[in-house]
């Protein structure tokens, strides 16, 4: 299934407009933000390991994850629950709590190592240089304070301005994110706003200090498709006009096809495939990614049953000895059950983004060789499965 097919189906629901390869690589609109500098990684995550040390054992929620975020681009993190997407984001934000801990790797923000900052140093950059939008705005906003005051608090924490100046900034950011009657909404409580408006408040809070990077953890999951389309357009506008880099965590491959520039597919705490968005859809390589795309319902299909990848994400306390996906993969061989594959490069786009796949099928191959590997979804018969739900490393 190529990207255009996914977009056609997604746009039928959201009313979005498909991008072409050219404007996905050059930007849908001219980028005017200071951060929109070609070829610069504003955030790098190198070999990150975040483990949870529980009474039952060690849970490798994030294991050897490397992600590069160019300035002014949207990076998609996709995969099933339990894949490590949210835990990667929480590690970057310094929000892991006991018994979770970053045990290895390096996180660099604009050239500065932020992996092990103390609480005071972390507070200086969180919400200021890097911010996060959480999945459910109703639980992220304090119900007993007006939403305007909550956004104002972030400004007063990071900027030397008066309360009156901070209030004016809040009203301006409410206008930018499309909140009607911003002066009135400043004094509204969360329960007085719709889900879409609450999410716009959260986006405004994340953007008010003009951070270099914004992490959006499934920001449209609780919204209807009309509001989802509005939020996605807003995120693209922030990227295009302000040069903001965005990490978008989602299950929705249609959303990925619509807004993302680069994609990382995660499974059981590891990156299984990474590529420029067009390359991922046109040259889908890892059996897991193929299965995800094959699972998308087709509008013109007469099939009575939807395709699924059999089995569940493995229990992170009892991962397979070999490839994390081997128990669900129809292409698994004896080697896959005993050895863990590395990330093998099979090509690169014009901007230097490598297409990499964590699968022995592509070991030592280039893009031309990779094209010869059989495509399509995996034979959805699992070699084995203990049937247990994974530890929550989503």
Predicted regions and their residues:
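Conserved ABC ATPase "signature" region
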Residues: 113, 165-184, 293
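Short catalytic/signature loops enriched in Gly
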Residues: 180-183, 274-382
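A short, flexible loop at the N-terminus of ABC-type nucleotide-binding domains that lies
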Residues: 38-42, 51-64, 95-101, 118-121, ...
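Conserved ABC transporter NBD signature motif
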Residues: 102-113
């Amino acid at each position: 299934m190529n990207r255009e097919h996914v977009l056609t189906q997604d746009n039928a629901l959201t009313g979005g407009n498909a991008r072409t390869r050219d404007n996905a690589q050059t930007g849908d609109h001219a980028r005017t933000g200071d951060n929109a500098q070609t070829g610069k990684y504003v955030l790098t995550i190198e070999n990150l390991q975040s483990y949870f040390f529980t009474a039952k054992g060690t849970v490798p929620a994030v294991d050897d994850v490397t992600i590069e975020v160019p300035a002014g681009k949207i990076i998609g993190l996709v995969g099933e629950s339990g894949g490590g997407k949210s835990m990667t984001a929480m590690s970057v934000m310094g929000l892991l709590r006991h018994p979770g801990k970053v045990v290895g790797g390096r996180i660099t923000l604009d050239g500065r190592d932020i992996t092990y900052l103390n609480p005071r140093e972390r507070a200086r950059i969180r919400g200021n240089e890097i911010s996060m939008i959480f999945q459910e705005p109703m639980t992220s906003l304090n119900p007993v304070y007006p939403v305007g005051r909550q956004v104002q608090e972030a400004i007063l924490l990071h900027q030397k301005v008066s309360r009156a100046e901070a209030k004016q900034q809040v009203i301006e950011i409410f206008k930018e994110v499309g909140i009607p009657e911003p002066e009135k909404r400043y004094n509204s409580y969360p329960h007085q706003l719709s889900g879409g408006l609450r999410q716009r408040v959260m986006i405004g809070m994340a953007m008010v200090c003009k951070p270099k990077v914004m992490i959006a953890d499934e920001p449209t999951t609780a919204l209807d498709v009309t509001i989802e389309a509005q939020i996605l357009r807003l995120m693209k506008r922030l990227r295009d006009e302000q040069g903001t880099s965005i990490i978008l965590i989602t299950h929705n491959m249609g959303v990925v096809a619509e807004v993302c520039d680069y994609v990382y597919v995660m499974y059981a705490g590891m990156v299984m495939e990474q590529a420029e968005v067009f390359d991922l859809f046109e040259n889908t390589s890892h059996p897991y990614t193929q299965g995800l795309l094959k699972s998308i319902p087709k509008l013109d299909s007469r099939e009575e049953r939807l395709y699924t990848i059999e089995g569940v994400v493995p229990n992170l306390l009892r991962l397979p000895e070999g490839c994390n996906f081997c128990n669900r993969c129809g292409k698994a061989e004896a080697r896959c059950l005993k050895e863990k594959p590395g990330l093998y490069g099979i090509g690169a786009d014009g901007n230097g983004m490598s297409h990499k796949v964590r699968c022995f099928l592509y070991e030592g191959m280039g893009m031309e060789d990779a094209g010869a590997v059989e495509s399509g979804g995996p034979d959805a018969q699992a070699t084995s499965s203990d049937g247990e739900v994974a530890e929550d490393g989503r």
